[in-house]
Structures are given as structure tokens and as C-alpha cells.
């Protein structure tokens, strides 16, 4: 319900900036004193990876919104879940890391569950589905590189801070290029922006980053696929869908 009066780029730009503002005092209080100790390892790698995960998150979000103009919700929901099998495949080819066989049954069950949950068996393949698959690639890369950066640098809030700022800036640029900027529309969506910005754009992504310090990318992707289940329950309970 957050894009009734403003476009998706502007919505993401504002909500991720809200997330940035919310995280900033937590960073100053909890992590600022640890920066020198952590970044002495390889500051260039830290900022490169933190910037990259922001770009991946922006591209995943943007392509998901664009694809909905050319496909339906069931297709988008199902093909987005493709990031689950993409994670171990990309990890293997990019970093030559072998994936334990026990992960694959769970990956297959995730795809099967997504197939049933989204009613994809009643869907028709559309031209926008390729965009959704590309979107899933960026979600997979986001999960993988979050795992890489947090395992080397114990600065989850700073990583989240950089990520939200990158997404906000790129989204605002997208809004300027592709949308009409409606300031009054932002105020009309105040509650939705605050909700999505504080809980999702801010805290949820930092919790993801923190959690991935102790878990490899493939199990992380499997766990994150529960988003579809929770979204279905929330849509039924909160929106009567």
C-alpha cells in the first residue's frame, strides 16, 4: 500500500533514507569505536563490498517493480524464488566453494513450495518473467556478498548504513529520471514509508547482515524464502487478500 501516491523509485528512495537516518545513531553508539580495528584488515574491500550489496539490493528491487508491468504477481513471486538455487550455483562458479549435498533437498523443496504457494500452475509465461529471473540473480548476489563482507568485518550496522544510503541515492536518481516527484505524495504515504523504512529498510536488513555472520549463503537463502510464506499470511491477515 506504500505506492498509492508516489512511484516505486521515489518510495524506495525515501524509505531507505529513513532507514539510513534510523541506523545512524545506533552506528555512532555501538560501532564507531570499532571502525579502525576492523577496517585495518582491508578497508578497500570493505567499502567495495558494502557499495556492491547496495547496488545489488537496488537492482533487485528496481527490476522487481519494473517486471510487474510486464508479468503478473504469481509469475513474479515464483520466479523471484529462483534466487534460492542461484545462490549455491553462483558461489560455486565465482568462489569455487563446494556446497554440501544436504542443502539441495531443501532448495528443491523451496521451489516446490513457491510453486504451490503462488498458484503458478495456473499462470502463463510472460515476457516480463525474464526480468524477474534477472532480479533473482541480484537478490542472490546480495545474499552472497553480504556473507562475504560480514565474515571479514564485524560491522553489521555500518554495512547496513552504507547499503541503505546507496539504495536511497540510486532510487532518487531513478525517480528523477523516470517518475514525477510528488512531495505531497510523500506526506500522504508517511505511515507506510516510516513502517517500511524503519522496520524493513533499517532493522530487518541489519539483522540479515548480522545473522549471516554465522551462516553460509545457501542456508541463508533457504531461510529468507520464508518471506513468501510470511507475506501470504500478512496479506490475508492485514489486507484481507
Language model features with spans:
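Transmembrane alpha-helical segments that form core, pore/gating elements
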Residues: 8-9, 20-23, 87-88, 124-179, ...
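Specific transmembrane alpha-helical segments of multi-pass solute transporters/efflux pumps
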Residues: 27-74, 79-80, 116, 197-215
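Helix-helix packing/entry segments at the starts of transmembrane helices
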Residues: 12-14, 76-82, 146-168, 201-237
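Membrane-interface helix termini and inter-helical loops of multi-pass transporters
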Residues: 1-8, 35-39, 66-70, 115-127, ...
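Loop-to-transmembrane alpha-helix entry segments
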Residues: 44, 80, 96-116, 125-131, ...
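Hydrophobic/small/kink-forming positions within alpha-helical transmembrane segments
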Residues: 54, 58, 62, 85-89, ...
Amino acid at each position: 500500500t506504500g505506492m498509492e501516491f508516489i512511484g516505486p523509485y521515489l518510495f524506495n528512495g525515501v524509505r531507505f533514507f529513513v532507514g539510513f537516518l534510523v541506523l545512524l545513531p545506533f552506528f555512532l553508539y555501538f560501532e564507531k569505536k570499532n571502525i579502525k580495528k576492523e577496517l585495518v584488515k582491508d578497508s578497500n574491500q570493505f567499502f567495495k563490498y558494502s557499495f556492491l550489496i547496495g547496488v545489488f539490493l537496488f537492482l533487485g528491487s528496481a527490476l522487481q517493480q519494473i517486471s510487474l508491468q510486464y508479468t503478473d504477481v504469481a509469475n513474479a513471486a515464483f520466479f523471484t524464488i529462483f534466487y534460492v538455487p542461484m545462490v549455491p550455483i553462483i558461489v560455486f562458479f565465482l568462489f569455487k566453494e563446494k556446497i554440501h549435498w544436504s542443502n539441495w533437498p531443501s532448495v528443491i523443496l523451496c521451489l516446490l513450495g513457491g510453486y504451490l504457494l503462488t498458484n503458478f500452475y495456473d499462470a502463463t509465461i510472460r515476457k516480463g518473467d525474464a526480468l524477474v529471473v534477472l532480479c533473482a540473480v541480484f537478490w542472490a548476489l546480495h545474499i552472497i556478498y553480504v556473507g562475504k563482507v560480514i565474515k571479514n568485518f564485524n560491522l553489521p550496522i555500518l554495512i547496513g548504513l552504507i547499503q541503505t544510503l546507496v539504495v536511497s541515492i540510486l532510487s532518487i536518481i531513478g525517480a528523477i529520471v523516470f517518475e514525477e516527484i510528488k512531495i505531497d505524495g510523500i506526506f500522504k504515504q508517511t505511515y507506510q514509508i516510516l513502517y517500511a523504512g524503519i522496520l524493513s529498510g533499517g532493522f530487518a536488513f541489519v539483522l540479515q547482515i548480522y545473522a549471516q555472520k554465522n551462516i553460509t549463503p545457501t542456508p541463508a537463502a533457504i531461510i529468507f524464502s520464508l518471506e513468501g510464506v510470511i507475506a501470504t499470511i500478512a496479506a490475508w491477515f492485514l489486507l484481507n487478500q
